[in-house]
Amino acid sequence: MSRLFKITALVPSLSRTRTQRELQNTYFTKLVPYENWFREQQRIQKAGGKIIKVELATGKQGTNAGLQ
């Protein structure tokens, strides 16, 4: 069982804009493996996004995540 982070982020979407001044933001939630967290964090920030919430998640509810 691998440790996962459940992240909620906000990234500006340039593909959905109708005019130059309008900027549409896209919210998304995804599970990211513990090992890939830093890479994912860099990707979101380079795209001009903000990480709103980070939670530790496991595959099953009630499973010990191994934090002590």
Swiss-Prot record:
Record has Repressor as a keyword: no
Main localization (coarse): membrane
SMART domains: CpcD (SM01094)
Location of this chain's protein in the cell: Cellular thylakoid membrane
Membrane topology recorded in Swiss-Prot or TrEMBL: Peripheral membrane protein
Alphabetized UniProt keyword annotations: Antenna complex, Membrane, Photosynthesis, Phycobilisome, Thylakoid
Thylakoid in keyword set: yes
Domain of life: Bacteria
Any one GO CC term of the record: plasma membrane-derived thylakoid membrane
Residue ranges occupied by any CpcD-like domain in the UniProt entry: 2-57
Residue ranges of coiled coil: none
BP term (GO), one: photosynthesis
Entry's family note: Belongs to the phycobilisome linker protein family.
Function statement: Rod linker protein, associated with allophycocyanin. Linker polypeptides determine the state of aggregation and the location of the disk-shaped phycobiliprotein units within the phycobilisome and modulate their spectroscopic properties in order to mediate a directed and optimal energy transfer.
Name under which the protein is recorded: Phycobilisome 7.8 kDa linker polypeptide, allophycocyanin-associated, core
